[in-house]
Amino acid sequence: KMKQGVSSLGFNLPNLEGRQVSLQDERYKGKVVIVSILGSWCPNCLDEAEFLAPWYKANKQRGVEIIGLGFERKDDFEYSKATLNRLKTKYGIEYDVLFAGKADPEGVAKVLPEVENFSGYPTTLFIDKKGNVRKIHTGFTGPATGLFYEDFKKEFNVLIDSLLAE
């Protein structure tokens, strides 16, 4: 959950081309934004990317954006650029994936001080058009979970539809 009295995220991180990206950028203003906290080493994150990449292609014109925050095995931009670019290529990801640092609890706390008790990868934050975090979901129930995955997709789309309608 978010820390008491805080509703938005202030990260400013490099994308894989080295350009700094934040939620204040023109591209994200007035849009619903999904922030996925991920690692290329995390199997459930790969399942989530496999869902989000085609979902984004089909829905981006509706005023919704996705940002991936990649926490990798090393706090090394060149190493992580390679691992995260492989992830982008494998799943055909068209949204920005940013290098957020090393995958450890301190790393996440440093990049996202607004989030209380980060508990695992992937964690997905749903942000409304005003920039407020409205929901945080930890974990991902992938296709192997059958009905749970169908329920997840339904709930995901209902949530995005309601945020877009505001």
Segments the model singles out, each with a brief description of its role:
Residues 28-33, 61-67, 91-96, 129-132:
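Loop/turn elements at helix/coil->beta-strand transitions in domains of secreted/extracellular proteins
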Residues 120-166:
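Thiol-/selenol-based redox modules, centered on thioredoxin-like
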Residues 1-25:
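N-terminal "domain-start" segment that seeds a small globular fold
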Residues 37-39, 69-72, 100-102, 128, ...:
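Active-site-proximal beta-strand/loop segments in catalytic clefts of secreted hydrolases
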Residues 22-52, 65-66:
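Short active-site neighborhood of thiol/selenol oxidoreductases, capturing the structured segment around
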Residues 47-92, 102-110:
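Structural microenvironment flanking redox-active thiols in thiol-disulfide oxidoreductases
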Residues 12, 84-123, 129:
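Short, internal strand/loop/helix patches
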